[in-house]
Amino acid sequence: MSLIEGLLQTSSTVTLLGTVLFLLVLYLRSSGSSSEGQGKEPPGPRPLPLLGNMLQLDLKKPYCTLCELSKKYGSIFTFHFGPKKVVVLAGYKTVKQALVNQAEDFGDRDITPVFYDFNQGHGILFANGDSWKEMRRFALTNLRDFGMGKKGSEEKILEEIPYLIEVFEKHEGKAFDTTQSVLYAVSNIISAIVYGSRFEYTDPLFTGMADRAKESIHLTGSASIQMYNMFPWLGPWINNLTRLKKNIADMKMEVTELVRGLKETLNPHMCRGFVDSFLVRKQTLEESGHMDSFYHDDNLVFSVGNLFSAGTDTTGTTLRWGLLLMTKYPHIQDQVQEEISGVIGSRQTLVEDRKNLPYTDAVIHETQRLANIAPMSIPHTTSRDVTFQGYFIKKDDSEWESPHTLTPSHFLDEKGGFVKRDAFMAFSAGRRVCLGEGLARMELFLFFTSLLQHFRFSPPPGVTEDDLDLTPSVEFTHNPSPHQLCAVSRV
């Protein structure tokens, strides 16, 4: 364990005082060059030197702290995460105004030190400027060509479902952790779109990539990495950062090897996936004399890494929340399975069935809303000086009738039909809206309905529904706390 991580885990008063003094020296050393911004800034709690407002923050549920502060300061206010000043937008209407109505102003990504270490300004998720615009445009066009969110995606998901069901069946109704099997199933969908083929769950290259991506997301949310984001000069003393950098190096090596194999068998007239399309575009530009385009190896490797990580953790985590919530609330599971049995019977569910399964669709949307796996999203930064709404705006009234419970009726009308809600922003909005939204919606619907069609989910022996803990695990995304479920065959 490193010095910094050891300090973070101790409760000794002497050590804590020593830590504060140690960090204060570093703060004084680094803060001399800071300058005040021009004009009146949004209100907020007064920050302490070095620590900012961190003593007011619930580290397990920081979004709860920020929501409470919005009641006092309004829907736009300032909060200091250590020495870093952040403007917080609270409430659906305010967020929509910024990300949609003023998309150009709020469309850049705030790239923290750890994410710069990950991507070096390349790829799709953690980049800005012309390179990001070109990579996102290329990704949107080509991922659609390979069926993301369309019939091609549906075929890939339907191909994967039997493999996941087989893994669940092997447990023969005994309690097990769904994390790994769900991770591999979802990872295979993006693998098929990016590389052109799926992997076996026993393939060490594939399992290594998937497990490493999951671990990296977990490490990114650790206290020591958040400390590094605030004080980058602490990097040499943070073990988690060393592990993350090794994971990124391994990812680059593995993606490079996979790309090399695809390059050797590349047919420009028959692209198998995203990588093939990128290689063809790169080759075409180079042959025409454009040697300094954005289509270079780093953008390819990091774009693939971004797609793989973003396309697996969020969807897989949401699906696991769905299974846990069905176990926690068996009466809702009953209604979902009754609807599936009445409409689908024993045949395979298809995307076109969604319109005839309004209750199931509502439960999936409500799972996304309640699980709220990225409650603070990924930080944005303004692309220029912005005047926004003025300050001390009255906080939005709650957009949800029962915000803290699983309530499918949030997405149902009085006749039981599915209804969209404007405040549902599970995929963000504006220029940075999730480019895989169509695919993720399709995966959640097909995987969820297929699993509920085949299995009855219940707590392990000796555990009641009330014992199941819905407190999320504190990571970069909100994962369910460690748990096991029983999947008993209904067929």
Swiss-Prot record:
Protein name (record): Cytochrome P450 2K3
GO CC term, one of those recorded: endoplasmic reticulum membrane
Cofactor(s) this protein cannot do without: heme
Entry EC number(s): 1.14.14.1
Family in the record: Belongs to the cytochrome P450 family.
Catalytic activity: an organic molecule + reduced [NADPH--hemoprotein reductase] + O2 = an alcohol + oxidized [NADPH--hemoprotein reductase] + H2O + H(+)
Gene Ontology MF term list: heme binding; iron ion binding; oxidoreductase activity, acting on paired donors, with incorporation or reduction of molecular oxygen, reduced flavin or flavoprotein as one donor, and incorporation of one atom of oxygen
Matches recorded under Gene3D superfamilies: Cytochrome P450 (1.10.630.10)
Record's keyword annotation contains Heme: yes
Residue sites binding heme per the record: 434
Annotated InterPro entries: Cyt_P450, Cyt_P450_CS, Cyt_P450_E_grp-I, Cyt_P450_sf, Cytochrome_P450_fam2
One GO-annotated biological process of the protein: xenobiotic metabolic process
Pfam families linked to this entry: p450 (PF00067)
